[in-house]
């Protein structure tokens, strides 16, 4: 079984992998990092013009990092939204994923938070810098292999 977007991508020869459906019937697709920008543009044109959320997580210690996008398409009315979840995986050593800021402006702070917490660089993001941690912070706090410092110097907390 395929969702509408997945079927459309297959029909047009665009490489992706379906990871199945969740309990609400929302399909999850895996997209390669190098294909993400073009598929994001296609998704927007296809009608997925609302980015509900973007988040990221560490798949496993020493393993891949994932950036997750929840897209919504409202074609027949607000009571019948069509949703899709897209996962883009990146290597831990140099995690780079194309930014979708220029497609969905709401990705701005969400991609910055993923960068700040996990170190995923979003190519062509206009303001990719730390948003939660101080600029001087070393490391990526939400990575499973992150070693927390023995002390925290809170200078700017006033």
Curated annotation (Swiss-Prot):
InterPro entries: NADH_DH_suC, NADH_quin_OxRdtase_su_C/D-like, NADH_UbQ_OxRdtase_30kDa_su, NADH_UbQ_OxRdtase_CS. NDH is composed of at least 16 different subunits, 5 of which are encoded in the nucleus. It is a peripheral membrane protein. It is found in: Plastid, Chloroplast thylakoid membrane. PANTHER family: NADH DEHYDROGENASE [UBIQUINONE] IRON-SULFUR PROTEIN 3, MITOCHONDRIAL (PTHR10884:SF14), NADH DEHYDROGENASE UBIQUINONE IRON-SULFUR PROTEIN 3 (PTHR10884). NDH shuttles electrons from NAD(P)H:plastoquinone, via FMN and iron-sulfur (Fe-S) centers, to quinones in the photosynthetic chain and possibly in a chloroplast respiratory chain. The immediate electron acceptor for the enzyme in this species is believed to be plastoquinone. Couples the redox reaction to proton translocation, and thus conserves the redox energy in a proton gradient. This is NAD(P)H-quinone oxidoreductase subunit J, chloroplastic. It comes from Platanus occidentalis (Sycamore). Its main location: plastid. It catalyses: a plastoquinone + NADH + (n+1) H(+)(in) = a plastoquinol + NAD(+) + n H(+)(out); a plastoquinone + NADPH + (n+1) H(+)(in) = a plastoquinol + NADP(+) + n H(+)(out). GO terms for molecular function: NADH dehydrogenase (ubiquinone) activity; quinone binding. Belongs to the complex I 30 kDa subunit family. One of its GO terms (biological process) is photosynthesis, light reaction. Its EC number is 7.1.1.-. GO terms for cellular component: chloroplast thylakoid membrane. Keywords: Chloroplast, Membrane, NAD, NADP, Plastid, Plastoquinone, Quinone, Thylakoid, Translocase, Transport.
């Amino acid at each position: 079984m395929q969702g509408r977007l997945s079927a459309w991508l297959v029909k047009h020869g665009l490489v992706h992998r379906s990871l199945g459906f969740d309990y609400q019937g929302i399909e999850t697709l895996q997209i390669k990092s190098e294909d993400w920008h073009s598929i994001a543009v296609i998704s927007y044109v296809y009608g997925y013009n609302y980015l509900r959320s973007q988040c990221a997580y560490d798949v496993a210690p020493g393993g891949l990092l994932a950036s997750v996008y929840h897209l919504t398409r409202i074609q027949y009315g607000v009571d019948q939204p069509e949703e899709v979840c897209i996962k883009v995986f990146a290597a831990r050593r140099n995690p780079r994923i194309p930014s979708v800021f220029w497609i969905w402006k709401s990705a701005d702070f969400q991609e910055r938070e993923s960068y700040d917490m996990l170190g995923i660089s979003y190519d062509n993001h206009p303001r990719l810098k730390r948003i939660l941690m101080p600029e001087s912070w070393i490391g990526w706090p939400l990575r499973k292999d992150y070693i927390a410092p023995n002390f925290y110097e809170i200078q700017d907390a006033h």
